[in-house]
């Protein structure tokens, strides 16, 4: 239970933690039978718990595999040479997959992980991080379907550690259209802002109030978002800005504005953003001054791009 607190947990006490086991038993009480088996340790080579866990898993309709990092493995002055989970956890997940039952992988960790070996073994992944004393309760709600998840990743998950640094707002490279690696993709496993829901959303094309605007001007952008699924849900609408040409090399893209909307099944909403050129398109130059250079800027929402021209 202590490991759910993570680093810098302040006044959090182990005795106050609602564990995953406690929360799941309460959530499914009278609705489903829940068996709990401690299958493997965080690290080491002890596989003695595998047999009992596999036996229970074969009788289950769904397997929930809770894996991850110890609470002290991340935080201040706590680095790891490899961001894969230890081999004993990998082997345990492989054995669970062999049962043929659906596997929900629940991760509790304090950093992005390398999941290239684990992801193919999971039918679903819930990233709960190290959520503190009440973290078990919302997790149980997501597992039961009482809660429709709407979170988005605030960090990028690489395919392998060799891709690091791979943060979303990294600088443009000289040959960014050709990629970086000869032996693998340049794309991450899960990018910044990724996150699934029990419903689905469809974005319309962003619409600008003007195609051109002055360096000290204002403009707005509207985008429609439709809930195309069968259940109500919330969607975080993220607005990115990209400046392909500037005196200083600019990031590939930067998150500059966002909102979150609750959208009923079948409903379409319009998200409106009032933007300020200096505030939302500007950057700090090598003299510490906030500047906006004239030229082309891309506004990206829901993976769709519209181009704005900033004039002198």
Placement of each model-derived feature along the sequence:
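Terminal connector regions
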Residues: 277-312
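Short acidic, flexible loop segments centered on an aromatic residue
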Residues: 230-247, 253-255
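Glycine/threonine-rich flexible loop motifs
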Residues: 2-6, 67-87
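A short helix->loop->beta-strand "cap" motif at the edges of active sites that frequently abuts
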Residues: 31-32, 99-103, 122-123
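Intrinsically disordered, low-complexity Pro/Gly/Ser/Thr-rich segments with frequent PxxP/GP/PP motifs
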Residues: 247-285
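An anion/phosphate-binding loop that grips the pyrophosphate of nucleotide cofactors and donors
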Residues: 60
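Secreted, periplasmic, or luminal enzymes acting at the cell surface/secretory milieu
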Residues: 1-8, 12-21, 25-28, 108-234, ...
């Amino acid at each position: 239970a202590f490991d759910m607190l993570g680093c810098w947990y302040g006044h959090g006490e182990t005795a106050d933690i609602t564990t995953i086991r406690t929360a799941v038993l309460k959530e499914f009480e009278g609705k489903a039978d829940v068996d709990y088996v401690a299958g493997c340790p965080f690290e080491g080579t002890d596989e003695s718990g595998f047999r009992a866990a596999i036996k229970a898993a074969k009788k289950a309709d769904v397997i929930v595999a809770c894996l991850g990092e110890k609470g002290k493995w991340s935080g201040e002055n706590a680095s790891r040479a490899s961001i894969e989970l230890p081999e004993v956890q990998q082997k345990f997940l492989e054995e669970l997959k062999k049962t043929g039952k659906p596997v929900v992988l629940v991760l509790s960790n304090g950093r992005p992980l390398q999941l290239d070996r684990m992801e193919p073994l999971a039918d679903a992944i819930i990233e709960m991080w190290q959520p503190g004393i009440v973290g078990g309760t919302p997790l149980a709600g997501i597992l039961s379907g009482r809660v429709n998840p709407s979170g988005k990743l605030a960090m990028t998950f690489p395919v392998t550690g060799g891709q690091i640094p791979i943060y979303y707002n990294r600088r443009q490279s000289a040959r960014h259209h050709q990629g970086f690696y000869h032996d693998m993709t340049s794309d991450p496993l899960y990018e910044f802002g990724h996150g699934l829901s029990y419903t689905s959303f469809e974005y319309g094309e962003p619409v600008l109030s003007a195609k051109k605007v002055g360096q000290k001007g204002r403009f707005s952008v509207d985008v429609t978002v439709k809930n195309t699924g069968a259940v109500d849900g919330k969607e975080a609408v993220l607005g990115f800005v990209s400046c392909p040409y500037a005196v200083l090399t600019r990031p590939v893209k930067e998150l500059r504005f966002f909102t979150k909307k609750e959208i009923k099944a079948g409903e379409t909403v319009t998200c409106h953003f009032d933007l300020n050129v200096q505030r939302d398109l500007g950057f700090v130059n090598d003299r510490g001054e906030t500047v906006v250079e004239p030229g082309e800027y891309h506004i990206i929402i829901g993976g769709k791009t519209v181009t704005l021209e900033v004039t002198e």
